[in-house]
Amino acid sequence: MGQKINPLGFRLGTTQDHHSLWFSQPKNYSESLQEDKKIRDFIKNYVQNNMIKASGAEGIARIYIQKRIDLIQVVIFMGFPKLLIETRPQGIKELQRTLQKEFNFGNQKLNITITRIEKPYGNPNILAEFIAVQLKNRVSFRKAMKKAIELAEQADTKGIQVQIAGRVDGKEIARVEWIREGRVPRQTIRANLDYCSYPVRTIYGVLGVKIWIFLDQAK
């Protein structure tokens, strides 16, 4: 059942790194872990509520959190930072203040920075958001999948696999549809593979979108 494992956790320490970096006492570990989840959810909700409405996607690839004794460093990797910054020039400072109010960090200073991703459509999270917007707008799932693959190919990826599961096109019986282009070596640990699982809420129910992107082979 090797194919059932999460491709990112499978490659930790080889081609993947942890998205959180901190040390904690065993008794405080679960609290710190929950705090990370809450911070990520809060940032995603804030970006969703304050971005340009026409875009329909957050454009967040991942959120990296590093905690020290006196500092909490949050780095937001975004494909389209203009979506947030153009509407509110003081967006980052405002987010920082709101986050500080929401969470009691005590003596720890909070620092938030935004890093732009060069090729946004080479990231599975941003591609999954793109597919979600298409499906919510009643675009055919095949058309949405093919367009996503075209965008990924323009971002110089070696291979991509897109899978949609659930009541596809509103059919009564749930099924799994997938499409692959190029190489996607899911069993090779040295393969630099990026992965994302994304739920899409449609009028027919929840669809599960999964995307595997093969970037490169680790030396």
Swiss-Prot record:
A matching Pfam family: Ribosomal_S3_C
Query: Quick check: keyword rRNA-binding in the entry?
Result: yes
Give the top-rank taxon of the lineage listed in the UniProt record for this protein: Eukaryota
Q: Which ranges carry the KH type-2 domain?
A: 43-118
Sequence similarity: Belongs to the universal ribosomal protein uS3 family.
Q: Which UniProt keywords apply?
A: Plastid, Ribonucleoprotein, Ribosomal protein, RNA-binding, rRNA-binding
Q: What GO molecular function terms would the record report? A: rRNA binding; structural constituent of ribosome
Record has Amino-acid biosynthesis as a keyword: no
GO cellular component assignments? cytosolic small ribosomal subunit; plastid
List where in the cell it is found.
Plastid
Gene that specifies this protein: rps3
Oligomer status and interactors: Part of the 30S ribosomal subunit.
The protein, known as: Small ribosomal subunit protein uS3c
GO BP terms:
translation
Please classify the protein's predominant subcellular localization into one broad category.
plastid
What are the top taxonomic ranks of the organism?
Answer: Eukaryota, Viridiplantae, Streptophyta, Embryophyta, Tracheophyta
